[in-house]
Amino acid sequence: LDEDNDCRMKDVIPVFEKEVFLERLKRIASIIEMPYNEVVQKFIDRYSGRLRHSVSYMLGASNFYMPIFEEALETYGLPLELKYLPVIESALNPTAVSRVGATGLWQFMLATGKRYGLEVNTLVDERRDPIKASYAAANYLSDLYKVFGDWNLVIAAYNCGPDQINKAIHRSKGSKD
């Protein structure tokens, strides 16, 4: 028996029918709409396939970060589902920097981070501080909800900026769909 080859666990990628995902999404109690469509399926395929090892890292990191996110969101009375935003924004990497300069778990742009009290200078970048950035993000999300009143628009505005969402609403003649 060659232990190295015969006893090694194989990386199995589970495959589920569309109905399984639909049923699981229906069972999630949330005030934030969670649609299932081709784009969602594409991300499910990506994260259960070639990015599977990233998911392992994120699951491990979530044990540390999720309680911080939850506390900040609860402080501002926000839906706890928003704790998954940094998973999408940064893959739970506190040192992540996007191609446009958004930094940290919550991917704050410089001006937005400073507007929400995060210190950024040559010595420190609090956008990378999990606790301070989480409270700043919760404050920002709360402000966005006061403006848009719809969680899908809030999430979109968080990602691309409120000005872009306002322009899209204006182009669609006021429709928020």
Where do the PLM segments sit?
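Membrane-interface junctions
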Residues: T75-L78, V147
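Substrate-binding clefts and substrate-entry loops adjacent to catalytic sites
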Residues: F43-Y57, L92-A102, Q107-L153, I169-D177
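An acidic, Gly/Ser/Thr/Pro-rich helix-cap/linker signature
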Residues: L1-Y76
